[in-house]
């Protein structure tokens, strides 16, 4: 069984755990509608992504 040669310092342990923190989601402002949306996601209100119509909304 593998055993660590040295004790992990609190600093190194904290640096390892820093990736586990919950980060606040980032938002980008849509150039056409001005709405906030997640980066690399399409705008659900208009159905546009990178200037192209991707989603066609149904009339109901």
Swiss-Prot record:
The gene is rpmF. One of its GO terms (molecular function) is structural constituent of ribosome. Residues 17-44 have a biased composition (Basic and acidic residues). InterPro entries: Ribosomal_bL32, Ribosomal_bL32_bact, Ribosomal_zn-bd. Pfam families: Ribosomal_L32p (PF01783). Disulfide bonds: none annotated. This is Large ribosomal subunit protein bL32. Belongs to the bacterial ribosomal protein bL32 family. SUPFAM superfamilies: Zn-binding ribosomal proteins. Residues 1-16 have a biased composition (Basic residues). Gene3D superfamilies: Single helix bin. GO terms for biological process: translation.
């Amino acid at each position: 069984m593998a055993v660590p040669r040295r004790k992990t310092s609190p600093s190194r342990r904290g640096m390892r755990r820093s990736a586990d923190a919950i980060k606040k989601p980032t938002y980008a402002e849509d150039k056409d509608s001005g709405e906030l949306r997640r980066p690399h996601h399409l705008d659900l209100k208009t159905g546009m992504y990178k200037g192209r119509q991707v989603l066609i909304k149904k009339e109901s």
